[in-house]
């Protein structure tokens, strides 16, 4: 009788343990499903906010580019445009991370070329503008 009692109790304990494991697995899978759904919702909201922010920044960058294209840019304006371009590259890299490094390298090379051209331009235009301003100043003194 003791043996039958021990077997019955062992069977009850094993079945209770199996049920608890099964319930744990079900609750974990339900929790995983709920977590996945909430992550999808968060990603959807984040994606919508990111796209809205990107479009707003692109509009701002276009507006600033048009403004600066029509007038002379100061050094501060140039820095602002560089920062905006960097932000736009960062935002684009969020959409396409595999292309980000390629674009960054390409942008660096273009920026390096532009800087060299600007340095050469300054070396040539600086003395020429100085001569023109001296000549105009001399003409104004003679007329006045």
Curated annotation (Swiss-Prot):
Signal peptide: 1-18
Single GO BP term: defense response to fungus
Summary of the tissues where the protein is detected: Expressed by the skin glands.
Entry keyword annotation includes Cytoplasm: no
Subcellular localization(s) per the UniProt record: Secreted
Propeptide: 19-43, 74-123
Superkingdom to which the source organism belongs: Eukaryota
In-chain residues carrying the UniProt-annotated modification Asparagine amide: 70
Residues where Leucine amide is found: 143
InterPro entries for the chain: Bombinin (IPR007962)
GO cellular component: extracellular region
Keyword list, A-Z: Amidation, Amphibian defense peptide, Antibiotic, Antimicrobial, Cleavage on pair of basic residues, Cytolysis, Fungicide, Hemolysis, Secreted, Signal
Stated role: Maximin-6 shows antimicrobial activity against bacteria and against the fungus C.albicans. It has little hemolytic activity. Maximin-H10 shows antimicrobial activity against bacteria and against the fungus C.albicans. Shows strong hemolytic activity.
Family statement drawn from the similarity comment of this UniProt entry: Belongs to the bombinin family.
Protein name per Swiss-Prot or TrEMBL: Maximins 6/H10
């Amino acid at each position: 009788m003791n043996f039958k009692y021990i077997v019955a109790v062992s069977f009850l304990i094993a079945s209770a343990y199996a049920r608890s494991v099964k319930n744990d697995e079900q609750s974990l899978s339900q929790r995983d499903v709920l977590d996945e759904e909430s992550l999808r919702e968060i990603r959807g909201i984040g994606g919508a906010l990111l796209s809205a922010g990107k479009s707003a920044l692109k509009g701002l960058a276009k507006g600033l580019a048009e403004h600066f294209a029509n007038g002379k840019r100061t050094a501060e304006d140039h820095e602002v445009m560089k920062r905006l371009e960097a932000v736009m590259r960062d935002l684009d890299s969020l959409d396409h991370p595999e292309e980000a490094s390629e674009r960054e390298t390409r942008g660096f090379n273009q920026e390096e070329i532009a800087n060299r051209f600007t340095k050469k331009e300054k070396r040539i235009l600086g003395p020429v503008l100085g001569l023109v301003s001296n000549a105009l100043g001399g003409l104004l003194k003679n007329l006045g």
